[in-house]
């Protein structure tokens, strides 16, 4: 998967903002990215502090761009644009104060074209990363919500790695039918970015009517709407998980679609199922989990775990930049 994304970035090099410019994990990942020449880190913070932190840690970040909100040349222009974007919800003084914060400043760098994408959250909360994105980058045309997916990769020593997409595992707590449709559409698009030919399964405790109830109806109805929304993508359900992934079970349950037994893109009914599901896959199925990958925004903005390591930062940077249209 990463070879696929790196080749894409080599053909079209990108710039990615890191909001925590002095963090050792960010600096280590930046040094590694710079050695590949396909992705330029844009580090937010004081240049002297960032340079000193890199030197003390032994990381070569020559070639990285450093942007400091304290002496940014186009700050007045940035403030004016943010006032316009907030449409009376924030005064000029409030915008200027917000832009002294790395997350707002970094998000505006993406908005103004100084960078293509942003990765934050190594020391900030998810809300600190997502809130500026919603206020400044906003949802793209046709999207009403921001959702998330995880890309799950199981390494193989003998052939191609197994790659799956799972959603929504982190953002929408109890999505409606229409929100599930949007989540499915966006997740199928994300899957394609990572080289997955999506076969989308709507998951439930029921397989094609074997169970009854409002929750089953919601997944079945959402599935039918998703089929209409993306007629060129195989979509089916509602399925129990085993019917979605096991050809034997799918045959036993008389599922004839190309999705049954062969699904690789999974839509969960709610965040409980999604979060539990991807973590079972990660911990007991020996899959590597990459995400949450935010979907539905006008530009790629992603959130790191505060417990991340430098390799995870490096990987998520490639993933985030790979999402740039």
Predicted regions located by residue number:
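Anion-binding alpha/beta catalytic cores of soluble intermediary-metabolism enzymes, centered on
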Residues: 1-260, 265-325
């Amino acid at each position: 998967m990463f070879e696929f994304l790196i080749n894409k970035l080599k053909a079209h090099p990108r710039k990615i903002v890191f909001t925590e410019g002095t963090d050792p994990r960010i600096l280590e990942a930046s040094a590694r990215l710079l050695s590949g020449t396909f992705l330029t880190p844009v580090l937010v913070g004081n240049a002297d502090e960032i340079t000193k932190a890199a030197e003390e840690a032994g990381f070569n970040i020559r070639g990285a761009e450093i942007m400091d909100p304290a002496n940014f040349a186009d700050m007045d222009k940035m403030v004016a644009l943010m006032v316009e974007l907030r449409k009376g919800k924030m005064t000029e003084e409030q915008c200027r104060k917000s832009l002294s914060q790395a997350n707002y400043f970094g998000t505006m760098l993406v908005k103004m074209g100084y960078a293509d994408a942003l990765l934050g959250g190594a020391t900030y909360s998810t809300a600190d990363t997502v809130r500026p994105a919603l206020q400044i980058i906003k949802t793209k045309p046709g999207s009403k919500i921001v959702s998330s997916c995880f890309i799950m990769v199981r390494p193989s020593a003998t052939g191609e790695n197994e790659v799956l997409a799972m959603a929504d595992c982190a953002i929408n707590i109890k999505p409606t039918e229409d929100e599930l449709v949007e989540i499915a559409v966006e997740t199928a698009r994300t899957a394609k970015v990572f080289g997955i030919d999506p076969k989308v399964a709507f998951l439930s405790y029921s397989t094609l009517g074997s169970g009854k109830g409002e929750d089953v109806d919601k997944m079945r109805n959402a599935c039918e709407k998703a089929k209409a929304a993306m007629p060129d993508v195989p979509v089916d359900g509602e399925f129990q998980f085993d019917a979605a992934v096991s050809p034997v079970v799918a045959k036993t349950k008389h599922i004839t679609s190309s999705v049954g037994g062969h699904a690789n893109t999974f839509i969960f009914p709610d965040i409980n199922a999604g979060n539990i599901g991807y973590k079972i896959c990660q911990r007991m199925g020996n899959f590597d989990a990459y995400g949450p990958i935010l979907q539905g925004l006008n530009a790629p903005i992603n959130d790191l775990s505060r417990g991340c390591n430098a390799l995870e930062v490096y990987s998520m940077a490639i993933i985030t930049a790979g999402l740039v249209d």
